Amino acid sequence: MKVYHSSDTAQVGTILINDYKKNIELVRPFVIALKQNKECFFNLCLSGQYMRAVLGKFNMKNMDTYSVKWATEGLFEYVRQNEFPGLPNRIESNYFFDSIESSKRLFEEDWGEADQEERDKIRLFEAELRDDNPALFDMNWFDEAFEVIYELESLDQIDTSIEYARNYFGGKQSENYRFEIVSNKEAVIVNDITEKLK
């Protein structure tokens, strides 16, 4: 199946490796915290808010939202493990789009405000995904959960984020849905089409 993938490290011929950065280690503590209880998860997120404030104060560019990203991924993984175990783990999968237009939209959302040097690092590829039945999810639910965790002030907000994760894995469409293809199967980069981002 032909799909589209953005990367700053891949090149034509690359076989994409699931979780090549080993980010699962950053997610696991949040999953463990939720297995204990919501209060434990809340406290871990609060520690992350403190680190975000420290990193922001010392101008450590692009570092201040990392703990929110991993907390959100941990919450989604907890929901997946407990309610949707047959679906792929987000962290141990690769992400794709079914069209160049969707890839361009994500590029603008993620790197639209970055300086040109950062934007130039991102390449757009056509890939051959060897998965007959990849998962298709509305990425807006993840973004909504991220925003809730970013502003986390109460345990009720954790329940809201859990509901967003259920919507994501349950295949529910948001009003302005944006689908991503998530697969833990082999994919090979076949063509660099970065010029189509412009």
Language model regions located:
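Conserved NAD+-utilizing ADP-ribose enzyme module
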Residues: 2, 8-62, 90-92, 101-114, ...
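Short aromatic-glycine-(Arg/Gly/Cys) micro-motifs in beta-strand/loop hairpins
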Residues: 5-10, 21-22, 64-88
